């Protein structure tokens, strides 16, 4: 497991091919708070920013992602 997730996209990518075990990323509470606060201030579109952050983790090699946005992200993906 790699945490915090977003600052270590390069680590996720490097680990991806080195081990034959599932790789998980944990989007910690600080990352959640950062996105939530910026969205509340109108600085970004919460849905787009959150989904992009999760897609970035997946592209970097995470096979599973633990996030405080899990329920919202599931709803957003279902609506898409």
Where are these regions (language model features)?
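Hydrophobic residues within beta-strands of alpha/beta enzymes
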Residues: 1-2, 65-66
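Active-site-adjacent beta->alpha loops and helix N-cap segments on the catalytic face
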Residues: 4-25, 71-80
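Active-site-adjacent loop and "lid" segments of alpha/beta metabolic enzymes
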Residues: 16-60, 79
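Conserved functional loop/turn residues at catalytic and ligand-binding sites
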Residues: 61, 69
């Amino acid at each position: 497991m790699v945490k915090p997730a977003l600052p270590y996209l390069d680590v996720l990518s490097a680990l991806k091919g080195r081990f034959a075990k599932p790789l998980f990323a944990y989007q910690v509470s600080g990352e959640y708070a950062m996105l939530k606060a910026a969205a509340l201030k109108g600085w970004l579109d919460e849905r787009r920013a959150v989904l992009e952050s999760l897609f970035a983790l997946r592209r970097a090699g995470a096979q599973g992602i633990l996030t405080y946005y899990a329920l919202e992200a599931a709803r957003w993906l279902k609506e898409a």
